[in-house]
């Protein structure tokens, strides 16, 4: 791998090859930002819709600063020291009692990504009318009604365009193991990211490589729980998956010194997740990976970088250093957060 110099970047004509300086334990922020800055639907929102919003809240100041940083990084290939953005992050985090982001301490890129998305969502959220129409004719419709009611309850007074990009609905079903006549109960909740466990042992013909699909199967497998005096079967399913799906691989144990470094086998394109969806039009959940956040180290410390896809080429961005990489190296034992975009969605 060779580093891309400023001259080479200028000649290539590829915008998006910009760097962020690490100004003191901010590699996790830089890694997260690079992944979000290469999220096409989020860029489209800022390019076409953000200008109609205005507010004096801390969250809006942060969102505006993110957009200013985004425009600068995409206007030309450059290296930026994001001091003002970091200062605003720390101010907002302190106001929200998120002390982990209010100082120059090493933090989790996955947690920061969700914090930033939630802040941007809060900065432009508004009340909207959400109507639920249609007839309930079968079991799938019963679940659909519960899902839509949950979505309405969560988002009717706090809606933003970011909901349509990052949010979908997860369903938890609970049923009595021994009373076969009892109908299952459903808990439906919106989500903006998924934390997938890494299974310990997966047996299959032809090898024991663990795949991303195996991680989804581990997450959605049946679980026996005791509620009161009764044993119940609990299962997590997805009514839908978002246009932009953010997956965190659960690599850290409660023991801070232990980290799962298992390589997860995963192709970069045409990832079919439809088997985990129980909602309507489930065949439409095919995804491509466009960015990843990598972590090297343990839970007590380490270093974050990002891999991003630009014009069908992959690059590793390590703070202020950019290297072109082979696509076979995008997913590896350091892969921590995976960003996927649904195929066929208008950008």
Tell me what each language-model feature is.
Residues 1-347:
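UBL (ubiquitin/ubiquitin-like) substrate-recognition surfaces
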């Amino acid at each position: 791998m060779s580093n891309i110099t400023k001259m080479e970047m200028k000649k290539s004509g590829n915008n998006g090859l910009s760097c962020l300086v690490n100004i003191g334990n901010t590699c996790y922020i830089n890694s997260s930002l690079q992944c979000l800055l290469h999220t096409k639907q989020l860029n489209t929102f800022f390019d076409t819709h953000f200008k109609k919003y205005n507010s004096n809240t801390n969250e809006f100041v942060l969102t505006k600063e993110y957009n200013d940083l985004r425009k600068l990084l995409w206007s030309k290939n450059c290296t930026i020291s994001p001091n003002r953005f970091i200062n605003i992050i720390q101010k907002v985090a302190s106001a929200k009692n998120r002390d982990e982001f209010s100082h120059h301490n090493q933090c989790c890129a996955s947690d920061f990504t969700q914090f930033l998305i939630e802040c941007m969502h809060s900065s432009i959220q508004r009340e909207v009318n959400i109507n639920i129409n249609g007839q309930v004719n079968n079991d799938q419709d019963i679940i659909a009604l519960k899902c839509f009611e949950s979505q309405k309850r969560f988002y009717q007074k706090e809606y933003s365009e970011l909901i349509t990009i990052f949010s979908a609905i997860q369903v938890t079903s609970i049923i009595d193991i021994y009373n076969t006549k009892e109908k299952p109960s459903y808990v439906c909740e919106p989500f903006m990211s998924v934390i997938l466990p890494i299974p310990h042992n997966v047996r299959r013909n032809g090898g024991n490589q663990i795949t991303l699909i195996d991680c989804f199967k581990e997450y959605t497998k049946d679980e026996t729980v005791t509620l009161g005096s009764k044993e119940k079967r609990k299962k997590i399913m997805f009514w839908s998956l978002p246009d932009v799906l953010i997956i965190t691989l659960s690599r850290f144990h409660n023991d801070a010194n232990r980290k799962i470094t298992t390589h997860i086998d995963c192709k970069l394109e045409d990832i079919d997740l439809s088997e985990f969806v129980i909602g309507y039009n489930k065949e439409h959940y095919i995804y491509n990976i466009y960015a990843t956040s990598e972590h090297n180290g343990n839970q007590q410390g380490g270093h974050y970088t990002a891999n991003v896809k630009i014009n069908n080429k992959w690059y590793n961005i390590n703070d202020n250093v950019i290297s072109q990489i082979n696509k076979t190296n995008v997913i590896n034992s350091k892969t921590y957060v995976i960003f996927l975009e649904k195929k066929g969605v208008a950008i």
